[in-house]
Amino acid sequence: MSACRVKPFLSVYLLVALLCVSLTSTAQSRYPQGLEQVGQARFSLLWLDIYDARLFSADGSYRPGEAPLLLELTYHRAISSRELVDETLNQLEGRFERAAVPGELNDLLPSVDDGDQLAFYLRADGAGAFYFNGKYLGELDDSDFNRAFLDIWLAPDSEYPELTRRLKGKE
């Protein structure tokens, strides 16, 4: 094959490869669809409603270690990004080594207002994506961190066992 014929072929090949990568990343950044609700719960401290939580899975049931899972939190009050990150780090204490928490977490947890929704989607491959009001924020590929993050709400020894039971559809 002459050099003149190879260049157009390589250009077309590169264009197709880039298009495939672009479509894959676009598909992964779309808000998850087709999941069934497992359970829901309201999280309150004293008399303050903080958020409503809903958990979704492929078939509407929760089985530890299985994915995909989608956790949606709809907030009832304003909370700064810094407060969300700090509380997340506090809740991860004992579940995940603080030094190993991905630095991107600071960029992925936005400030929220009353009515805002923050969602975390754990894919079957262990990657986790964050969404804010349905808009893709970014993802973390650390499957150990992603599981520990969901365990804040789903672990048998979570700080709020009633919330955990309801999210798992047990009440």
Which sequence ranges carry the predicted segments?
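Bacterial N-terminal signal peptides that target proteins for export
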Residues: 2-13
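N-terminal signal peptide c-region/cleavage motif recognized by signal peptidases
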Residues: 22-24
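Terminal leader/tail segments of proteins
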Residues: 26-171
